[in-house]
């Protein structure tokens, strides 16, 4: 009987990091914020593996523990940006716990960690490779291959717009010669001037039957449908990179990091 009570108490003790993370994830899912919930769930899973079944409270979360967590992740082959991703999710969860008065400590365990994502030259492909992607003839390929290529270019032309933000663009975001939208992840408002190449893509996918600018979502789509399409388009953009014999895997992140890497160049983009 005592064991049952202890298990019940554990699963209702929000001072336990995994229990609190579960409550945050459930709340996000109820609000329809499936992407953030998925990110937190991934970070939670990694930390649960690190704990190896041991209970762990927020009071025990110190810089030294986080250092061990980083070592644990690296020893399992996680790349620096993956490690940084997990730490950023846990910092966000920790900050929520502070705001909810679950954590009362002022030790700031994340203060000395470098949580910035690296922009690597490996991802920042040359402008000549971008031109190859722009000019490749895909008329004999499935229409989804052209869509994957066009989404890659759309991201590049819009200064690295994320996949999820492209998905949710609608006609109200078109305001004259500008594209104005809020980032799904942060709510930050952005404005992008619509130049010729971007206008071509917008016009190509314009449809009176959809409120969206690009054909990834339909009205009423579930998050799972969005993720399934994202996986397919990710697969196709990698296949396009192989087709062009690029010296690196082609992903939508490449378009985003290409912009970051070259944003101070003199190339007219």
Label the model's feature ranges.
Residues 22-35, 44-121, 136-139:
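N-terminal core-binding DNA-recognition domain of tyrosine recombinases/integrases
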Residues 95-104, 155-176:
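Short, charged phosphate-coordinating catalytic segments
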Residues 130, 195-247:
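Active-site/catalytic core of tyrosine-dependent DNA strand-transfer enzymes
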């Amino acid at each position: 009987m005592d064991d049952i009570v202890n298990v019940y108490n554990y699963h209702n003790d929000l001072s336990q990091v995994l229990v609190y993370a579960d409550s945050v994830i459930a709340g996000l899912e109820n609000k329809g914020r499936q992407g953030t919930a998925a990110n937190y769930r991934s970070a939670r899973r990694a930390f649960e593996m690190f704990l190896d079944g041991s209970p762990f409270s927020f009071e025990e979360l110190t810089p030294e523990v986080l250092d061990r967590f980083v070592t644990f992740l690296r020893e399992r082959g996680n790349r620096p940006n993956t490690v940084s991703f997990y730490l950023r999710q846990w910092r966000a969860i920790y900050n929520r716990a502070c705001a909810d008065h679950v954590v009362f400590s002022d030790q700031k365990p994340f203060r000395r960690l470098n949580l910035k994502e690296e922009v690597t030259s490996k991802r920042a492909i040359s402008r000549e490779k971008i031109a190859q992607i722009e000019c490749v003839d895909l008329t004999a390929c499935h229409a989804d291959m052209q869509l994957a290529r066009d989404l890659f270019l759309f991201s590049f032309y819009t200064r690295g717009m994320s996949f999820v933000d492209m998905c949710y663009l609608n006609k109200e975001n078109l305001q004259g010669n500008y594209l104005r939208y809020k980032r799904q992840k942060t709510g930050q408002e952005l404005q992008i001037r619509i130049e010729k190449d971007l206008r071509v893509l917008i016009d190509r996918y314009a449809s009176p039957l959809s409120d969206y600018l690009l054909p990834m979502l339909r009205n009423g789509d579930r998050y799972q449908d969005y993720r399934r399409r994202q996986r397919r388009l990710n697969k196709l953009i990698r296949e396009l990179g192989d087709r062009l014999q690029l010296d690196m895997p082609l992903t939508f992140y490449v378009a985003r990091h290409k912009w970051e890497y070259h944003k101070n160049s003199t190339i007219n983009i």
